[in-house]
């Protein structure tokens, strides 16, 4: 949904890059970082794909990452060679067999834990990057010794294990 100069999205939506070279490079993201019913606003250079019924976030994400689907998107792009875009109406024209509800339920049951794990690993990577960014200047300046930093890293990793 366009809002002013941007697009509106919420948790569970999949953001699909519409502009070259981002689409060709596979830029796709699951929105899972907003608080409660918070709504995010962003660039018009991605298309928002929202789950409906048993068509879950993980099913949409898997489709959006599937090479044949991405190739169909790439072929449907228009515009000058350096700034090609995929029109949002591509999705109303693209046909795909809808899986049976039983299969969708089984797929969702198998993939939702993986999506949760992806989010946890992303959060862990961010925390570790912050720790690195805080420790590196201290180590390089000599204000902190390696063994002191090692203790801080061990404590942080112990907290990570407790959180997962």
Residue ranges and their predicted role:
Residues 1-5:
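Short alpha-helix capping/helix-loop boundary micro-motifs
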Residues 6-7, 118:
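His/acidic/aromatic-lined binding-pocket segments of jelly-roll/cupin-type domains
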Residues 7, 14-65, 69, 77-87:
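A short beta-sheet element
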């Amino acid at each position: 949904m366009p809002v002013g100069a941007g697009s509106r999205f919420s948790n569970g939506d999949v953001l699909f890059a519409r502009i070259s070279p981002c689409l060709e490079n596979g830029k796709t993201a699951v929105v899972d970082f907003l608080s409660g019913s918070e709504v995010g606003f962003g660039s018009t250079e991605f298309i928002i794909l929202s789950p409906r019924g048993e068509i879950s976030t993980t099913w949409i994400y898997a489709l959006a990452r599937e090479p044949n689907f991405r190739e169909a998107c790439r072929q449907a792009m228009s515009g000058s060679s350096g700034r090609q875009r995929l029109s949002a109406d591509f999705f109303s024209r693209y046909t795909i067999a809808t899986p049976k509800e039983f299969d969708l339920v089984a797929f969702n049951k198998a993939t939702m834990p993986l999506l949760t794990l992806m989010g946890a690993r992303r959060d862990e990577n961010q925390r570790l990057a912050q720790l690195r960014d805080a420790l590196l200047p201290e180590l390089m300046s000599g204000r902190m010794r390696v063994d002191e930093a090692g203790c801080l890293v061990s404590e942080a990793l112990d907290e990570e294990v407790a959180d997962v």
